[in-house]
């Protein structure tokens, strides 16, 4: 008997995304995973750490709906659309909840993804120590 490899998005989120989890929803322009983000919102997930190279409107919506506690990113903007208003509200006014930010360079976050995919605890990135990033945080 063959097993059905297909599962609904509702069931996938219910089974694999829990309060307090770390979630990365990547994709650019037409590949932004809006359906997955909206399903996370519908299921009322909370205290998530979200990771994304360039957070955009889907993460802004998740922040605005109170799903996100911490965001790891490398560029906090919404190219072509403008500011992330809910992200700004969360950082400046703790509304709807305080938001912890962890910022990396694009190269640093890309290397972190490579390390994770390789089941390694980190990836060495030459040159990151010679920037002002750590002093500016």
Q: What are these language model-derived features?
A:
Residues 1-137:
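Conserved alpha/beta enzyme-core scaffold
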């Amino acid at each position: 008997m063959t097993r059905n490899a297909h599962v609904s998005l509702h069931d996938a989120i219910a089974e694999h995304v829990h309060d307090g989890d770390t979630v990365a929803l990547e994709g650019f322009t037409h590949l932004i995973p809006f359906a997955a983000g909206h399903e996370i919102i519908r299921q009322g997930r909370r205290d998530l750490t979200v990771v994304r190279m360039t957070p955009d409107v889907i993460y802004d919506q998740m922040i605005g709906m109170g799903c996100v506690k911490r965001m790891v990113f490398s560029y906090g903007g919404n190219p072509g659309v403008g500011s992330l208003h809910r992200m700004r509200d969360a950082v400046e006014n703790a509304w709807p909840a305080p938001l912890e930010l962890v910022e990396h360079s694009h190269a640093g976050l890309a290397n972190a993804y490579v390390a994770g995919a390789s089941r390694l605890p980190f990836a060495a990135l030459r040159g990151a120590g010679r920037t002002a990033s750590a002093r500016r945080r």
